From Swiss-Prot:
This is ATP synthase subunit delta. F-type ATPases have 2 components, F(1) - the catalytic core - and F(0) - the membrane proton channel. F(1) has five subunits: alpha(3), beta(3), gamma(1), delta(1), epsilon(1). F(0) has three main subunits: a(1), b(2) and c(10-14). The alpha and beta chains form an alternating ring which encloses part of the gamma chain. F(1) is attached to F(0) by a central stalk formed by the gamma and epsilon chains, while a peripheral stalk is formed by the delta and b chains. It is a peripheral membrane protein. It comes from the Bacteria. It comes from Dehalococcoides mccartyi (strain ATCC BAA-2266 / KCTC 15142 / 195). The gene is atpH.
Amino acid sequence: MAKRVYAIAMRYAQALYELAKEQKSLDKWQEDLQDLSSLTEDASVAEFLSNPKIASARKHKVLAKLSNIDPLMLNLVDMLVATRRLGIMRAVSGEYNRLLNEARGVEDAIVTTAKPSSEADIEIIRQQLSKITGKKINVVTATDPGLIAGLKARIGDKLIDGSVSRRLVLLQNEISQGRI
């Protein structure tokens, strides 16, 4: 089921990306998608949009008034509502961002540290990850006190684990196997 949703979201995102590229509106559409994604995750908005008793034209007008979104983007919402796929809006937005980042040579890195990092530390991490990947890195930070110290960085499907908790697990394995 998840693969099917991803495949559908990917098709929508690819079509949107091509259209935005054609109209030279890549960044604007990225913002619009993020706004729509947040808006459609609101329970009352999702309920309103999914209500079959409310005419599509009225839904369209309300969305247009709620946001400053490109009319073509509103057509996407109309289509998702009509096909009962409004729930994939977040996936469409995420896939669009991935396509945009890929075209620009940018990769997202989720960096988790034991405690919040300073901007200077984040910049150093960004530079190091950029050297490793050869791409520009967009850092998203998270904290997990369970790491004790160090960091974990997830870039796509790769994980760089430089945490003290991971080193302790490795040390424990070495001791339990009698290597130390």
